Amino acid sequence: MDERSNDPSRRAWLTRAVAGGAALCVHPWALAASEKWPTRAITFIVPFNAGGATDILARLLASRLSDRLGQTIVVENRVGASGILGTDATARAPADGYTFTVSLTTNLLLNQFLYSKLPYDPRRDLVLVSLLARAPVTLVVHPDVPASDAPSLLAYIKANKGKLSYGSWGVGSHGHLACAYMSRTQDADMIHAPYKGEAPMLQDLIGGRIQLAFASALGSKPQIDAGKLKLIGVTGKTRMDILPDGRTLFEQGLTDDAYSVVGWSGMAAPARTPPALVQRMATELAAVAAMPDVRARVADIGFSVVASSPEAFVQAYDQDLPIWENLVKVSGARLD
């Protein structure tokens, strides 16, 4: 038996997800309550600055959902402590179906391994609503790096042990964990240069102060198009709509989970949010995500639309969790 089936936190999540799926069938009153919802404004808490990909996604969904539901949806950027403040605010909010968070893998999954203590337990204090979109990242290098694909890059970093630096948008970020794994498995002893955000990291990569980095497609594509950065590949097992000619690292022979796993943007709510309302929100999100203009805009920011059911989100989370946990261990990343 899979040991994870004995994890109390996971059992609680699965129970809530199954309860959500069954609620509309078992309780007619729940269906009536969900049909009346919402009767006032809804808040989407985004634990990141305005203007980033997650914020753009949240505002796009809020606009379309507001039209469908006939109520205002307020997007609140609650920034601070690597997304902890906004996520904690969601966990502590009334579980009445009027507060949700639109967040990333970092806050909903990774932070529990990066911090010895969090003010919230993501698997106890939140309920997953929908995996909104998958967010692969690009592996880019300075144009002077003599590599044009993944195999030649690995050969280059091996041949230059201890001489190369990679950047990330912060300790414990996807970019940090993936490059640390690459350095460790190739015995490359690359130096990690963490930045406070992706923009300064990309500027130093363009300037040649670091040699390689994983970066969002939203941030890297303009620099790739301008010839200021060279694209080596993208994470995941499918190519990105925004970079259709960019081969996946998996295609190029890097089949490790570290390169196949992708980040995601997801919606969660306070743990005791009524299952019928969780299901109703997921259903509405799926309808919005099917709109061609929404799918096109999401592709423009380097994401691919999913808009899953709560049950499917729990399954995806459970599949990804041991991969990310191992990447944190390999990197040695800690944030407290």
Protein language model regions, located:
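N-terminal secretory signal peptides
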Residues: 1-25
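N-terminal signal peptide c-region/cleavage motif recognized by signal peptidases
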Residues: 27-30
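N-terminal (or domain-start) structured segment
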Residues: 32-123, 163, 171, 188-211, ...
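Short beta-strand/turn micro-motifs at beta-sheet edges
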Residues: 33-34, 125-129, 251-259
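An extracytoplasmic/periplasmic, membrane-proximal ligand-sensing/linker region
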Residues: 39-41, 188, 226, 275-336
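Hinge/capping helix and adjacent helix->loop/strand transition within the periplasmic-binding protein
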Residues: 92-98, 113-200, 249, 264-297
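A ligand-binding cleft/hinge motif common to bilobed small-molecule-binding domains
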Residues: 107-117, 180-185, 212-246
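C-terminal lobe and pocket-closing loops
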Residues: 220-289, 322
